Protein backbone atom coordinates (compact mmCIF):
# COMPACT_ATOMS: atom_id res chain seq x y z
CA UNK A 1 0.00 0.00 0.00
CA UNK A 2 1.24 3.46 -0.82
CA UNK A 3 1.98 5.64 2.19
CA UNK A 4 0.78 9.08 1.14
CA UNK A 5 1.98 10.79 4.34
CA UNK A 6 5.69 10.25 3.69
CA UNK A 7 7.34 13.53 2.70
CA UNK A 8 9.46 11.88 0.02
CA UNK A 9 6.30 10.75 -1.69
CA UNK A 10 5.16 14.14 -3.02
CA UNK A 11 4.57 12.79 -6.50
CA UNK A 12 1.56 10.84 -5.23
CA UNK A 13 0.10 14.00 -3.73
CA UNK A 14 0.70 15.74 -7.06
CA UNK A 15 -1.14 12.97 -8.87
CA UNK A 16 -4.05 13.09 -6.44
CA UNK A 17 -4.25 16.88 -6.63
CA UNK A 18 -4.11 16.93 -10.42
CA UNK A 19 -6.75 14.19 -10.57
CA UNK A 20 -9.18 16.07 -8.29
CA UNK A 21 -8.40 19.39 -9.95
CA UNK A 22 -9.05 17.94 -13.43
CA UNK A 23 -12.37 16.56 -12.26
CA UNK A 24 -13.49 19.87 -10.76
CA UNK A 25 -12.40 21.84 -13.82
CA UNK A 26 -14.19 19.46 -16.15
CA UNK A 27 -17.41 19.48 -14.12
CA UNK A 28 -17.59 23.23 -13.78
CA UNK A 29 -16.68 23.61 -17.44
CA UNK A 30 -19.63 21.38 -18.32
CA UNK A 31 -21.92 23.33 -15.98
CA UNK A 32 -20.75 26.67 -17.37
CA UNK A 33 -21.02 25.69 -21.05
CA UNK A 34 -24.36 23.91 -20.80
CA UNK A 35 -25.79 26.52 -18.38
CA UNK A 36 -27.57 23.76 -16.50
CA UNK A 37 -29.16 24.69 -13.19
CA UNK A 38 -27.12 22.66 -10.71
CA UNK A 39 -27.96 21.74 -7.16
CA UNK A 40 -25.54 20.34 -4.63
CA UNK A 41 -26.87 16.83 -5.25
CA UNK A 42 -26.41 16.97 -9.00
CA UNK A 43 -22.89 18.38 -8.59
CA UNK A 44 -22.09 15.50 -6.22
CA UNK A 45 -23.42 13.03 -8.81
CA UNK A 46 -21.25 14.70 -11.47
CA UNK A 47 -18.21 14.43 -9.20
CA UNK A 48 -18.73 10.74 -8.53
CA UNK A 49 -19.52 9.94 -12.16
CA UNK A 50 -16.48 11.70 -13.62
CA UNK A 51 -14.14 10.41 -10.92
CA UNK A 52 -15.15 6.89 -11.89
CA UNK A 53 -14.56 7.69 -15.55
CA UNK A 54 -11.17 9.26 -14.83
CA UNK A 55 -10.08 6.33 -12.67
CA UNK A 56 -11.13 3.88 -15.36
CA UNK A 57 -9.08 5.84 -17.90
CA UNK A 58 -6.09 5.66 -15.55
CA UNK A 59 -6.67 1.95 -15.07
CA UNK A 60 -6.95 1.16 -18.77
CA UNK A 61 -4.14 3.35 -20.07
CA UNK A 62 -1.80 3.06 -17.09
CA UNK A 63 -0.78 6.72 -17.29
CA UNK A 64 1.69 6.48 -14.39
CA UNK A 65 3.73 3.79 -12.69
CA UNK A 66 1.27 3.75 -9.82
CA UNK A 67 -1.51 2.69 -12.18
CA UNK A 68 0.49 0.37 -14.45
CA UNK A 69 -0.24 -2.80 -12.49
CA UNK A 70 -3.92 -1.97 -12.31
CA UNK A 71 -3.99 -1.05 -16.00
CA UNK A 72 -2.27 -4.26 -17.06
CA UNK A 73 -4.63 -6.28 -14.85
CA UNK A 74 -7.65 -4.61 -16.44
CA UNK A 75 -6.22 -5.03 -19.94
CA UNK A 76 -5.42 -8.72 -19.37
CA UNK A 77 -8.87 -9.37 -17.95
CA UNK A 78 -10.60 -7.58 -20.82
CA UNK A 79 -8.45 -9.28 -23.45
CA UNK A 80 -9.09 -12.71 -21.91
CA UNK A 81 -12.83 -12.11 -21.86
CA UNK A 82 -12.75 -10.78 -25.42
CA UNK A 83 -10.63 -13.64 -26.76
CA UNK A 84 -12.79 -16.27 -25.06
CA UNK A 85 -15.90 -14.58 -26.45
CA UNK A 86 -14.44 -14.47 -29.95
CA UNK A 87 -13.33 -18.07 -29.64
CA UNK A 88 -16.80 -19.05 -28.46
CA UNK A 89 -18.46 -17.24 -31.34
CA UNK A 90 -16.14 -18.75 -33.93
CA UNK A 91 -16.67 -22.21 -32.41
CA UNK A 92 -20.42 -21.77 -32.52
CA UNK A 93 -20.70 -20.13 -35.93
CA UNK A 94 -22.40 -23.20 -37.32
CA UNK A 95 -24.55 -23.37 -34.21
CA UNK A 96 -25.57 -19.76 -34.73
CA UNK A 97 -26.46 -20.42 -38.36
CA UNK A 98 -28.52 -23.41 -37.26
CA UNK A 99 -30.24 -21.29 -34.61
CA UNK A 100 -31.05 -18.58 -37.17
CA UNK A 101 -32.54 -21.18 -39.53
CA UNK A 102 -34.62 -22.61 -36.67
CA UNK A 103 -35.89 -19.12 -35.77
CA UNK A 104 -36.86 -18.46 -39.40
CA UNK A 105 -38.62 -21.81 -39.62
CA UNK A 106 -40.42 -21.11 -36.35
CA UNK A 107 -41.64 -17.74 -37.67
CA UNK A 108 -42.79 -19.33 -40.92
CA UNK A 109 -44.66 -22.06 -39.05
CA UNK A 110 -46.20 -19.52 -36.68
CA UNK A 111 -47.38 -17.41 -39.63
CA UNK A 112 -48.85 -20.51 -41.27
CA UNK A 113 -50.73 -21.36 -38.07
CA UNK A 114 -52.03 -17.81 -37.79
CA UNK A 115 -53.14 -17.84 -41.41
CA UNK A 116 -54.84 -21.20 -41.01
CA UNK A 117 -56.65 -20.02 -37.87
CA UNK A 118 -57.73 -16.87 -39.70
CA UNK A 119 -58.93 -19.02 -42.60
CA UNK A 120 -60.92 -21.18 -40.16
CA UNK A 121 -62.47 -18.09 -38.60
CA UNK A 122 -63.40 -16.74 -42.03
CA UNK A 123 -64.90 -20.09 -42.99
CA UNK A 124 -67.04 -20.28 -39.85
CA UNK A 125 -68.18 -16.67 -40.38
CA UNK A 126 -69.08 -17.50 -43.96
CA UNK A 127 -71.02 -20.59 -42.87
CA UNK A 128 -72.84 -18.54 -40.25
CA UNK A 129 -73.63 -15.87 -42.79
CA UNK A 130 -75.02 -18.52 -45.17
CA UNK A 131 -77.20 -19.99 -42.41
CA UNK A 132 -78.63 -16.61 -41.51
CA UNK A 133 -79.25 -15.45 -45.06
CA UNK A 134 -80.79 -18.64 -46.54
Swiss-Prot record:
Write down the membrane topology.
Multi-pass membrane protein
> Which compartments does it reside in?
Host membrane
Main site of residence? Answer: host cell
Which keywords does the record carry? Host membrane, Membrane, Transmembrane, Transmembrane helix
Question: In which domain of life is the source organism classified?
Answer: Viruses
Cellular component, GO annotation? host cell membrane; membrane
Give the transmembrane region(s).
Answer: 16-36, 43-63
Q: Which family does it belong to?
A: Belongs to the plectrovirus ORF5 family.
Protein name (record): Uncharacterized protein ORF5
Specify the species: Spiroplasma virus SpV1-R8A2 B (SpV1)
Q: What is the lineage of its organism?
A: Viruses, Monodnaviria, Loebvirae, Hofneiviricota, Faserviricetes
Amino acid sequence: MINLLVENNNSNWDKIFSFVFDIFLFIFDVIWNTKLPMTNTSIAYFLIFFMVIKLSIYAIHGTSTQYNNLGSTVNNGVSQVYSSTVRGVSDTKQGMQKHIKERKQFKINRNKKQLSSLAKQAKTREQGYRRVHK
